[in-house]
């Protein structure tokens, strides 16, 4: 029992406890009213730090996903433009295939060329005008564009879209023809000699080198279509190399395709002025295509060029095609797939004099000047092995070792859609390959855009989950558990009620001293 009246210890202790309970109850009340466990740094300093960092990451993830949505929108616009370009290229390819048909006359091919040029202009406009928020997407300027997707520094994805301008679409072309007028003239002039300028011997090879450093080499043993012995030397068709290249899966993977053509012009004039075939004399002319005899005929009288052309076409059956050049003075010989054109002229002179004064078979190459060959009682042979055209999507270097093709390392020259010309059969054939390469480029760009969209969408989905989990982690630290906090509040409330009652009792204790004063 208290016997002092100047200091009521029990009341003081009860009051202190009451104030503590009041403070705790008020804080619990604020937590219940705000839903926050941490109302200030004093409540949980380390918890506040962690919660604020988590909130920062969550905000960054939210904005990063918004950035991803912007990027996906831009890429979808780009993909739509590229899809339109593909449709135009497909139509261009159809027209190039149509132009390659020799049934078309020059006017029809010119009309097809105009259609192709209009399609090319449409591609140009799409490539120049496709944009997102003023940013050009398909003209090559959309390069190394960074999309910041994450909540942290350097969490970016670099996006590039290659140019689809017509001057950027196409392929690399390397063209070579090993025959020259001089070589052919030598064959005709030096009758009976062996010409090895167009041959492949054992150990010879043809090599391709690409810009990424990879290389492919074909040696003469089987890979070029022939078996060679140690001493043998054989004529090699352009068509044989074409078949080898086009059937090689590695080259196909590099986008390499070969095409061969063989068009030879000869200054052949058959009239009474230049060719005098006396009675009893014979001139036998034989043509081979790829080693196969396709035409042979013996003439004992004057023959015109028109008749000679008709004789060849009637007998060769499409394996060798004869026509006249625009001047009407040259014989033009062509093979469908670049096979070797071989010619033999055999003169049987009945009286021993020179009867052939001007059959210029020496100018088998287009545009080359012929020479007069005086032949008596002998056989002359000339060979043109075809023009080899190699085309690819990426730049490459091709070199032949021991064969006439590409004796010096030759890099492909880029030919774009602007170079497409289908006014000739050769141009239409090359145009098909160039457009195929353009389609390959466009499809590559489309797949890259699609892959990037999928990548961004995957990042978006992952970050959406990460944001949810981050928000939950922050909530656990920062927000109040109402069930637990209500229990605490009830406890403090009861303590306050009992504290007030006990403080009243403690304040009454000093009154007991009055009993001693009675």
Swiss-Prot record:
Q: Which gene encodes it?
A: flaA
UniProt keywords, alphabetically:
Bacterial flagellum, Secreted
PANTHER family in the record, alphabetically? FLAGELLIN
- Name of the molecule in the record: Flagellin
Which species does this protein come from? Aquifex aeolicus (strain VF5)
InterPro entries noted in UniProt: Flagellin, Flagellin_C, Flagellin_C_sub2, Flagellin_N
Family to which this protein belongs: Belongs to the bacterial flagellin family.
Name the job this protein performs: Flagellin is the subunit protein which polymerizes to form the filaments of bacterial flagella.
The answer to whether keyword Acetylation applies is no
Which SUPFAM superfamilies does this entry report, sorted A to Z?
Phase 1 flagellin
- A GO cellular-component term linked to this record: bacterial-type flagellum
List where in the cell it is found: Secreted; Bacterial flagellum
């Amino acid at each position: 029992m208290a016997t002092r009246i100047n200091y009521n210890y029990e009341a003081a202790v009860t009051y202190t406890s009451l104030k503590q309970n009041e403070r705790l109850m008020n804080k619990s009340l604020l937590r219940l009213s705000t839903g926050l466990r941490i109302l200030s740094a004093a409540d949980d300093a380390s918890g506040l730090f962690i919660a604020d960092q988590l909130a920062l990451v969550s905000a960054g993830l939210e904005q990063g996903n918004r950035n991803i949505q912007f990027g996906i929108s831009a890429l979808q616009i780009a993909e739509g433009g590229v899809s339109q370009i593909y449709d135009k290229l497909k139509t261009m390819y159809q027209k190039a295939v149509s132009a390659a048909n020799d049934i078309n006359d020059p006017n029809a091919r010119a009309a097809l060329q105009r259609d192709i040029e209009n399609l090319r202009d449409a591609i140009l406009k799409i490539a120049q005008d496709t944009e997102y928020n003023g940013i050009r997407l398909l003209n090559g300027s959309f390069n190394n564009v960074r999309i910041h997707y994450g909540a942290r520094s350097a969490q970016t994805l670099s996006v590039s879209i290659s140019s689809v301008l017509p001057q950027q679409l196409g392929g690399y072309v390397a063209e070579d023809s090993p025959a020259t007028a001089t070589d052919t003239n030598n064959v005709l002039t030096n009758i009976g000699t062996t010409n090895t300028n167009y041959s492949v011997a054992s150990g010879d090879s043809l090599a391709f080198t690409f810009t990424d450093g990879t290389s492919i080499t074909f040696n003469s043993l089987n890979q070029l279509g022939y078996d060679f012995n140690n001493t043998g030397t054989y004529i090699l068709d352009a068509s044989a190399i074409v078949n080898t290249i086009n059937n090689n899966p590695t080259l196909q993977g590099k986008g390499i395709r070969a095409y061969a053509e063989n068009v030879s012009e000869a200054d052949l004039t058959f009239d009474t002025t230049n060719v005098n075939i006396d009675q009893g004399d014979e001139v036998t002319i034989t043509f081979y295509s790829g080693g196969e005899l396709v035409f042979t005929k013996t003439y004992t009288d004057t023959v015109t060029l028109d008749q000679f052309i008709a004789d060849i076409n009637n007998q060769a059956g499409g394996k060798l095609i004869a026509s006249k050049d625009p001047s009407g003075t040259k014989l033009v010989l062509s093979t469908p797939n670049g096979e070797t054109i071989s010619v033999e002229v055999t003169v049987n002179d009945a009286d021993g004099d020179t009867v052939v004064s001007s059959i210029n078979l020496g100018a088998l190459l287009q545009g080359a000047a012929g020479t007069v060959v005086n032949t008596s009682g002998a056989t002359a042979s000339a060979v043109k092995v075809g023009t080899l055209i190699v085309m690819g999507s990426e730049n490459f270097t091709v070199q032949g070792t021991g064969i006439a093709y590409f004796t010096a390392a030759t890099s492909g020259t880029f030919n774009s859609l602007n170079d497409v010309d289908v006014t000739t059969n050769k141009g239409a054939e090359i145009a098909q390959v160039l457009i195929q390469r353009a389609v390959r480029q466009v499809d590559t760009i489309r797949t890259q855009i699609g892959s990037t969209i999928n990548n961004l969408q995957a990042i978006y989905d992952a970050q959406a989950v990460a944001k949810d989990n981050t928000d939950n982690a922050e909530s656990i630290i920062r927000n109040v558990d109402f069930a637990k906090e209500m229990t605490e509040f009830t406890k403090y409330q009861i303590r306050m009620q009992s504290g007030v009652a006990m403080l009243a009792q403690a304040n009454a204790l000093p009154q007991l001293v009055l009993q001693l004063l009675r």
